[in-house]
């Protein structure tokens, strides 16, 4: 119903409610993330469970505008959790036709570059030069993350129809 509320340009209870709430025209939604950080604060799920939940809930992200496809984005791994990528891709590509490419258009990758730990990340604007160098060093790690997660994705999607969303 949420996708209908946002994107349907017609008469329906959800489109009517959107108009009543002050937004007559539908929004254009290019990307729709199904879950966020589901390995942590977004549900504390294991990857197999999330992959199956993704398969279920992506069904409800319908294209109400036949001219505009909503790209469905699955929740990807936290940093170097390659098992998450492996198991989500496995669950999403299990027993479907190749044209469905895992019922997703993208898989996100979460990586936060902070000089220390998440709990001691420091200020975004006031930091020592050594913290700047630490942050830049961690930023360079992104190339390895992209390369290794992409290799896993390619096992299931050799035609590269599923993009990595960083």
Question: What are these model-predicted stretches?
Answer:
Residues 1-130, 143, 147:
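N-terminal catalytic cores of secreted or lumenal carbohydrate-active enzymes
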């Amino acid at each position: 119903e949420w996708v209908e509320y946002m994107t349907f340009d017609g008469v329906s209870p959800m489109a009517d409610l959107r108009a009543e709430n002050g937004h007559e025209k539908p929004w254009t939604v290019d990307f729709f993330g199904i879950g966020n950080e589901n390995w942590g604060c977004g549900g504390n799920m294991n990857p197999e469970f999330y992959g199956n939940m993704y398969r279920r809930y992506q069904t409800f992200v319908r294209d109400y505008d036949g001219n505009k496809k909503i790209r469905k984005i699955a929740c990807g791994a936290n940093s170097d959790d390659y098992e998450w990528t492996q198991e989500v891709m496995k669950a999403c590509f299990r027993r479907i036709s190749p044209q469905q490419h895992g019922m997703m258009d993208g898989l996100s990758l979460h990586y936060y570059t902070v000089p220390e730990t998440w709990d001691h990340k420091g200020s975004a604007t006031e930091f020592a030069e050594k913290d700047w160098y630490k942050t830049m060093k961690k930023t360079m790690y992104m190339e390895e993350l992209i390369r290794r997660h992409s290799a896993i994705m390619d096992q299931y999607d050799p035609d590269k129809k599923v993009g990595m969303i960083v």
